[in-house]
C-alpha cells in the first residue's frame, strides 16, 4: 500500500495487491476498482455522482493515475505486461535501457531511454511519447528516498521548464499503517 501526492495537486492511495486506488484532485474524489470498473465511485464536493459524469470522472482519474503512478514508480513497472526492454549503446559507448510500453495504460507505444548510474539507478531519461510533438526530450530522476517498506523512489522530475514533485510518500502493509481505516476501500468492494 502506498499514498503520495503528485505535483502538489493529485493525491493517491493505492492498494496494488487488491487493485484499488483513490484519486483526489480539487473537489473531486474517485475510487477505482481496477478489476471491476463498474464498481468505481466518484464524488464532487462530497456529493456522489451517478449520472453520465461518473464515467467521465472515472476515465479522467484513471488517466491521471496511469501518468502519475508512472512518474512515481517507473523503475518498478519495467517488468509489467506489455513492456519491452533493450540495452542500447549511447554516447561514449555507455549502456542505457530502452523501455517501450506496447500495451496498457493510456498511451501505448511510448518509449523512454533511461541512462543509469554505476549502481543502475536512473539518472535521467529521454522520452518519445505520443502527446509531445518532438522526441528525445530529456527529464531527470532526482531526490531519491527510501520508503518505510524499503522501496526507492525519485521525488523530483525535471522536464524542460517543468518540475514535478512527488510528496507525502507513505507506505505500509495495510491501510492503518498509512493512517487510514482498513475499511477505506469498502465503498468499492
Predicted region positions:
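Short, basic/low-complexity N-terminal boundary segments at the transition from targeting/disordered tails
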Residues: 1-6, 63-71, 115-132
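Short, ordered beta-strand-loop transition motifs
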Residues: 15-17, 87-95, 147-149
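Gly/Pro-enriched, hydrophobic low-complexity segments
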Residues: 94-183
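Residue-level detector of beta-strand structural context in well-folded domains
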Residues: 2, 10-12, 21, 83-86, ...
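N-terminal mature ectodomain segment of secretory-pathway/periplasmic proteins
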Residues: 1-47
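Residues that act as N-cap/strand-start positions at coil-to-secondary-structure junctions
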Residues: 6-8, 17, 26, 79-81, ...
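Flexible, processing/modification-adjacent segments and terminal tails
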Residues: 41-108, 132-135, 187-189
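Catalytic loop of the DD-peptidase/beta-lactamase superfamily, centered on the K-T-G motif
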Residues: 29-37, 44-66, 106, 157-189
Amino acid at each position: 500500500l502506498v499514498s503520495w501526492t503528485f505535483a502538489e495537486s493529485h493525491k493517491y492511495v493505492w492498494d496494488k495487491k487488491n487493485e484499488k486506488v483513490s484519486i483526489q484532485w480539487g473537489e473531486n474524489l474517485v475510487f477505482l476498482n481496477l478489476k471491476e470498473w463498474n464498481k468505481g465511485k466518484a464524488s464532487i464536493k462530497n456529493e456522489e455522482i451517478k449520472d453520465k459524469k461518473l464515467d467521465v470522472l472515472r476515465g479522467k482519474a484513471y488517466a491521471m493515475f496511469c501518468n502519475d503512478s508512472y512518474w512515481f514508480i517507473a523503475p518498478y513497472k519495467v517488468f509489467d505486461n506489455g513492456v519491452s526492454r533493450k540495452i542500447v549503446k549511447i554516447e561514449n559507448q555507455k549502456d542505457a535501457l530502452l523501455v517501450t510500453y506496447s500495451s496498457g495504460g493510456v498511451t501505448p507505444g511510448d518509449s523512454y531511454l533511461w541512462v543509469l548510474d554505476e549502481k543502475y539507478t536512473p539518472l535521467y531519461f529521454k522520452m518519445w511519447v505520443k502527446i509531445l510533438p518532438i522526441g528525445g526530450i530529456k527529464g531527470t530522476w532526482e531526490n531519491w528516498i527510501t520508503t518505510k517498506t524499503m522501496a526507492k523512489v525519485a521525488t523530483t522530475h525535471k522536464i524542460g521548464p517543468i518540475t514535478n514533485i512527488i510528496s507525502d510518500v507513505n507506505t505500509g502493509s495495510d491501510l492503518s499503517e498509512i493512517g487510514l481505516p482498513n475499511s477505506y476501500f469498502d465503498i468499492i468492494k
